[in-house]
């Protein structure tokens, strides 16, 4: 089966663009990019060895630009969906601020620039991983999985989990257990996060024809899956502590954060109708963002604290 939707090909004459700088910034999905940059930064700082500050900044910029490029290509391909959903109707392409050819050119240019710069100036292991991340998000997730299976964000979540792996490879030129643990945390965090969103945006996804789990399997089944994935997430996030990769401070914090996320997931499972159900899903969605940032912030603070201790010891 082809992953290319021929309906997405532009057959009309190009029109004059009204795009401004803000529109092109919006194409980069700044909120998503902030998560990409933050998790990548943690992966980079956890990596062993010395890394020149100029190369570190270069690598972070390339990862950020690569993530933004993937977002632009996602918007290029999904303009038909975005125009039908309340949450995305104000994006630059549905609003007519940016044309599809402009978004495509913008995304491809940034993708090429970020991958080549990272490969040439840093190393090609990181460059290849960044290229794979962009490819996976744009082709595997956006063009194929999102429109074809209710497991779209489960499999597609791998793309969002790769930035810390890319950043680790930028420092070391190789892979190790630690970045794969970070990958696993983000990977198992993705389903409960996005399914909570899908529960209170169910009508949006149904109207656009996107086979999100609540649309295909129903809300009750989705609530069960959220609970099951949250249980797995809590275990996976805590595992690096007893395995000796992360500290006891991280371990205790991960259990505390995970415990509260599990409580919120249980509320989503129990409250299935009315305002209580809506409030439960919104609370889980909001906390899931805080959960991931807090978990990675603890790792970041530990790295900084160790560096300061070595400096003054």
Curated annotation (Swiss-Prot):
Pathway: Porphyrin-containing compound metabolism; heme O biosynthesis; heme O from protoheme: step 1/1. PANTHER family: 4-HYDROXYBENZOATE SOLANESYLTRANSFERASE (PTHR43448:SF7), PROTOHEME IX FARNESYLTRANSFERASE, MITOCHONDRIAL (PTHR43448). Converts heme B (protoheme IX) to heme O by substitution of the vinyl group on carbon 2 of heme B porphyrin ring with a hydroxyethyl farnesyl side group. Carbon 2 of the heme B porphyrin ring is defined according to the Fischer nomenclature. Keywords: Cell inner membrane, Cell membrane, Heme biosynthesis, Membrane, Transferase, Transmembrane, Transmembrane helix. It comes from Rhodopseudomonas palustris (strain HaA2). Its EC number is 2.5.1.141. PROSITE patterns: UBIA. InterPro entries: Protohaem_IX_farnesylTrfase (IPR006369), UbiA_prenyltransferase (IPR000537), UbiA_prenylTrfase_CS (IPR030470), UbiA_sf (IPR044878). It is a multi-pass membrane protein. The gene is ctaB. This is Protoheme IX farnesyltransferase. One of its GO terms (molecular function) is protoheme IX farnesyltransferase activity. HAMAP family: CyoE_CtaB. The keyword Transcription regulation does not apply. It catalyses: heme b + (2E,6E)-farnesyl diphosphate + H2O = Fe(II)-heme o + diphosphate.
């Amino acid at each position: 089966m082809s992953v290319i939707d021929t309906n997405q090909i532009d057959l009309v004459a190009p029109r004059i663009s009204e795009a401004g700088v803000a529109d092109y910034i919006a194409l980069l999905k700044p909120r998503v990019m902030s998560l990409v940059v933050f998790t990548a930064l943690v992966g980079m700082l956890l990596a062993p060895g010395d890394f020149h500050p100029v190369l570190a900044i270069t690598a972070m910029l390339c990862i950020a630009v690569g993530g933004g490029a993937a977002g632009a290509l996602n918007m290029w391909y999904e303009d038909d969906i975005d125009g039908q959903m309340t949450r995305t109707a104000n994006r630059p392409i549905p609003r007519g601020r940016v044309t599809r050819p402009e978004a495509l050119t913008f995304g491809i240019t940034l993708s090429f620039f970020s991958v080549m710069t990272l490969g040439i100036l840093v190393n090609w292991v990181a460059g290849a991983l960044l290229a794979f991340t962009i490819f996976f998000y744009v082709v595997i997730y956006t063009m194929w999985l999102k429109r074809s299976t209710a497991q779209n964000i489960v499999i597609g979540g791998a793309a969002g989990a790769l930035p810390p792996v890319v950043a680790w490879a930028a420092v070391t030129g190789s892979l190790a257990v630690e970045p794969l643990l970070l990958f696993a945390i983000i990977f198992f965090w993705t389903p409960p996060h996005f399914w909570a969103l899908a529960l209170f945006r169910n009508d949006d996804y149904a109207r656009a024809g996107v086979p999100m789990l609540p649309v295909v399997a129903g809300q009750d089944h989705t609530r069960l899956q959220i609970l099951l994935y949250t249980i797995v997430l809590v275990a996976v996030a805590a595992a690096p502590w007893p395995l000796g990769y992360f500290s006891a401070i991280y371990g205790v914090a991960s259990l505390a954060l995970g415990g509260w996320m599990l409580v919120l997931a249980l509320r989503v499972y129990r409250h299935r109708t009315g305002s209580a159900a809506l409030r439960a899903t919104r609370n889980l969605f909001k906390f899931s963002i805080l959960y991931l940032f807090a978990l990675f912030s603890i790792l970041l603070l530990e790295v900084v604290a160790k560096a300061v201790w070595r400096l003054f010891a």
